[in-house]
Amino acid sequence: MRSKAIAALGILSLFASIVPAFGQTKIGVITSLTGSLAAFGEAHKNGYAIALDEINAKGGVLGKKIELDFYDDQSKPDQAVQGVSKLIDQDQVPVLLGSYSSESTKAIVPAVSQRETPLIIPTATADNVMDSKSPWIFRVCAGANDYAKETIAFLKANGAPRKMAIVYENTNFGQSNMKAMTAAAKEAGIELVAVESYEAKSPDYKAVLQRVKQANPDVIYFCSYLLDATTLMRQSREVDLNPKYYTSSGTGFAAAEFPTEKGAGKNAEYTFSVSQWLPEAKWAGSKEFDAEYFKRFKSHPAYHAIQAYAALRVAAQAINNAKSLDPAKIRDAIKNINMSSTPFGPIKFDNGQNQHPVLITQVQKGQYRVVFPADAAETKPIIPAPVWSKR
């Protein structure tokens, strides 16, 4: 009798592990809701909310509504790893979305792969988050190499500067973008006259910026999150640093708050950034997403929000295509997914990487405007950036 009871309990346990709570299907989300990256985590949460309502309004997945199971990584990689254990081991989610930063995402890749659960990455651009070649890992956003190559293509088409400085935070995110741009600049024949790292969230970068000023670059390429992007531009003005081009690997320089008084304000003018989306992008539903976001949250979204939206759309489509909550079947469905039209553009994965185009934007009169490539441009770039004394 005891063996039969144990067997019965085992079957019930297995059944509970693959069947969600009645009437709903849980999808796990790790993002940064507190800590230094909370502004980006909030953008994630907002993007997920719009996708969630759209999907559930159309019947959810497999006839059941989706519920998002959030875990706050507190902007810390070790907390993100704990989130994997909580969401997969305890909550038994069949697919995971996250995290925000490259640091936290790189930390969770081995843990998710070991648990044989699909991970859909919305925003982490460091290319080494994909180094494992794990069949369980998929990235919606473009990576650091794509950012560097498109920035170089833009520079070649707009004045072809010969000297560059790279200023990057000393983290996985910053190092990955620095290495990508170093290689791209070398290939393009652009001289690197300064490569300066800094510790994130410091109050004073003037010593770094003074060294860059002495090197006299035509263009600066920043790799920074929002707080540092704001400080770097304010202190660039204070030390009277005047390159012809202020460029960046996005992130802080592409945040919705950056050109506002919550960020760099007027100091953001004329800065260039890579971007993966703007409302003006020529993708079906792009402007409608922007309008819905503004209606709900009283601000216009940066691309981080729509990347989260896209990640959840992929997860839902994959579950429906798989006709199952089995993680392996969902993984195979993601591999074969071909979403030809979304507000984030077409989505199709090649070895886990979505082939997403990169845009170059410039802050003009407090707004991000697409200036490159030519077939997507709204307006012409303003080059050179006016010197600070003439602004």
Give the positions of each predicted feature.
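Extracytosolic ligand-binding ectodomains
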Residues: 3-15, 22-391
